[in-house]
């Protein structure tokens, strides 16, 4: 499907597990169907948010803007820290949390499920990559189906949330799940991400296999002039705003000469 956004809803709903999300030639996760296993139930089309777009008229709803009062939370978050506060409160109320972490070994973003605050710090901050959400979403469905008291809050991109919303409605589980989608301007290709890491390895000494601390939107120096910051256990560091400004200064100077 040309308009496919890679939300994974078709893979999650498939009763035969014959739809898998695979990286295509352009570096994006897209569904790949095993036609031999398909039973033509059409559930994949029924939950597809590209086929069934449920638009919201913003003039008909009340909207609020907010941010975390505690500066530490805002600093550690990509924006105002509201997602973290929602997750904290949800845990207190007994909800399971489904959000995005970064897998340093595989160098990709992945949805993970949590049921307590321990480990949830991995959810903090945006991951500007297409996340692998299907396994976590399927686990959410299993939890909801086998435990009538289980509730969840799911965080994701608009297409992922639209897709899982259709799945939950189809499964009659929607009432026990809170959905939170984030602003999204599109995700880069994993081919580009792989090339970037190769450059970091060769040019900046960020060797494969070493533990990294990756912040996609570091606000150490400024909220608006943010940058990506990467630190490894070998003390190599990349992304400091001083390095960036120095490079920009050199470029500007050379242009004037």
Name every feature range the model reports, one short phrase each:
Residues 6, 40, 153-154:
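Conserved SAM-binding loop
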Residues 36-37:
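Short, charged amphipathic alpha-helical surface segments
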């Amino acid at each position: 499907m040309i308009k496919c956004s890679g939300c994974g809803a078709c893979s999650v709903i498939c009763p035969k597990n014959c739809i898998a999300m695979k990286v295509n030639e352009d570096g994006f996760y897209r569904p790949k169907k095993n036609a031999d296993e398909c039973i033509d139930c059409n559930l994949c089309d029924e939950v597809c948010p590209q086929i069934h777009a449920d638009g919201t008229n913003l003039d008909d709803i009340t909207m609020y803007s907010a941010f975390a009062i505690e500066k530490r939370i805002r600093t550690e978050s990509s924006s105002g820290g509201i997602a973290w506060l929602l997750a904290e409160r949800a845990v207190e109320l007994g909800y399971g949390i489904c959000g995005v972490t970064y897998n340093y070994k595989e160098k990709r973003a992945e949805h993970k499920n949590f049921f307590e605050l321990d480990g949830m710090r991995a959810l903090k901050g945006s991951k500007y990559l297409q996340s692998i959400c299907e396994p976590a979403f399927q686990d959410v469905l299993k939890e909801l189906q086998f435990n009538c008291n289980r509730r969840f809050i799911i965080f994701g991109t608009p297409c992922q949330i639209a897709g899982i919303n259709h799945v939950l409605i189809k499964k009659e589980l929607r009432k026990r799940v809170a959905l939170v989608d984030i602003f999204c301007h599109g995700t880069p290709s994993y081919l580009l991400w792989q090339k970037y890491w190769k450059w970091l390895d060769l040019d900046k000494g960020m060797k494969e296999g070493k533990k990294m601390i990756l912040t996609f939107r570091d606000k150490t120096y400024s909220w608006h002039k943010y940058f990506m910051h990467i630190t490894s256990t070998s003390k190599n560091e990349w992304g400091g705003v001083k390095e960036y400004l120095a490079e920009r200064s050199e470029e500007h100077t050379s242009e004037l000469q």
